[in-house]
Design a protein with these regions (language model features):
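Short cysteine clusters
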Residues: 36, 298-303, 309
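Short cysteine/histidine-rich zinc-coordinating motifs and their immediately flanking basic loops
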Residues: 312-322
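Mg2+/Mn2+-dependent nuclease catalytic core
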Residues: 141, 148-258
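Metal-dependent nuclease catalytic cores that hydrolyze phosphodiester bonds in DNA/RNA
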Residues: 1-168, 173
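Polybasic (Lys/Arg-rich)
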Residues: 243-302
């Protein structure tokens, strides 16, 4: 099956559910759960998993409040207003971009009036044309590219990502710019927010490296430091720093090596399977035909279906639904009923389960001795 045919099949599978554009956050999160083929197929089909979770009756809390979203949009607008004045000022601080030599190009929309995947493909081509001009050392080439679209290969399929900005300076390096709305207070950033920002910047850097490689240029032209622009304190005045993403890049490359291939996804997606926003039961049946690997870490990875998959694991009586410590304590025993039967000496343990069985029987005796059950 050709790439175009598989893309058409994925679009048909998505049915009437809305499509969402992937970004660095969703790519990084999906790579954190490489064993879950369900998530991989839904990501490849650009399914709005938040909407899907709502249809399935297990919506997740919004990742950001409306206030936070509005603040983020306001801050990015502030950074880029007046011809990218603040953006260019911060680039001058971090990478010595000379202001008189700054030439800006906005790639936020394609000249061809299309939408969806076709638009992203066209914008990616227009970004490559701008990059070719820039790397040719044309003195009039734009060297600050707003909303450039680069591509990342994940298991043989192409993911198109819109960058906040790319900048090139006289040292012959391309820099990824990441604009975030969390504040820098007294020159300190909350590490809980800094870690995912660094990881997302690494996704964009890797995407830009792959794009240059496909164009015949060296990936070494991309700096492994990203420029992070955030508000200073609690107002919208920008400040900036550089992020060293080398460790994150190494981890991402390892995860990409483990990502499911397109041929594997083709084999796992049943022919004719579609999602339907109008029929919850049909939607659930379709989702259940996609193999998953629920782990408590799915809740931390930001997967919108984590609550749904946990509910299904709980209904099935799987120990994994009780959390990581419990799952690890029970080792090879996957089902709660088997654990309870083993504690009651109702089933004979295998040689791998004998120590666990002895512990469970001992705990059961202590529980009963304390009056917690029938003697």
């Amino acid at each position: 099956m050709s790439t175009d045919e598989f893309e058409a099949r994925l679009e048909a599978f998505r049915g009437d559910l809305p499509a969402v554009r992937p970004n660095a956050r969703t790519v990084a999160a999906a790579l954190d759960t490489p064993d879950c083929r369900r998530r991989r197929i839904l990501e490849a089909a650009s399914v709005d998993k938040s909407e899907l979770a709502r249809h399935l009756g297990h919506p997740i809390p919004a990742a950001q409040s409306p206030f936070a979203l509005r603040r983020g949009n306001l801050f990015e607008s502030a950074v880029k207003e007046n011809g990218d004045a603040h953006l260019i000022a911060e680039l001058r601080k971090q990478i010595d971009l000379p202001i008189p030599a700054t030439r800006h190009k906005d790639l936020s929309s394609s000249r061809a009036r299309t939408k969806g995947l076709k638009e992203m493909k066209l914008r990616a081509k227009e970004t490559q044309a701008a990059l070719s001009l820039l790397l040719s050392e044309d003195p009039y080439a734009p060297n600050v590219l707003d909303h450039a679209v680069t591509s990342l290969e994940v298991g043989g399929s192409t993911v198109y990502l819109e960058q906040d900005a790319l900048a090139h300076y006289t040292g012959n390096k391309l820099y990824v710019v990441e604009i975030k709305s969390f504040p820098v207070i007294n020159n300190q950033v909350d590490p809980v927010k800094l870690r995912p920002a660094t990881r997302q910047a690494a996704v964009y850097i890797l995407s830009l490296q792959q794009t240059l490689a496909r164009m015949g240029h060296s990936p070494e032209k991309v700096a492994t430091d990203a420029v992070l622009i955030c508000p200073r304190n609690y107002d919208l005045t920008p400040t900036s720093a550089t992020l060293d993403t080398r460790q994150e890049l190494r981890g991402l490359r390892r995860q990409l090596d483990r990502a499911a291939s397109v041929s594997e996804l083709e084999a796992l997606l049943p022919q004719g399977l579609t999602l339907s926003a109008a029929d919850t039961e049909h939607c659930a049946e379709a989702v259940e035909q996609l193999p998953n690997a629920y782990r408590p870490a799915c809740l931390d990875s930001g997967c919108e279906l984590a609550y749904y998959c946990r509910s299904r694991a709980r209904d099935a009586g799987e120990t994994v639904a009780l959390g990581t410590p419990v799952r690890q304590a029970f080792g090879p025993v996957d089902m709660i009923d088997d654990v309870l039967a083993m504690a009651d000496s109702g089933i004979a343990p295998s040689r791998y389960e004998q120590d666990l069985a002895a512990d469970l029987i001992h705990m059961q005796k202590l529980y009963r001795a304390a009056g917690g059950g029938a003697a």
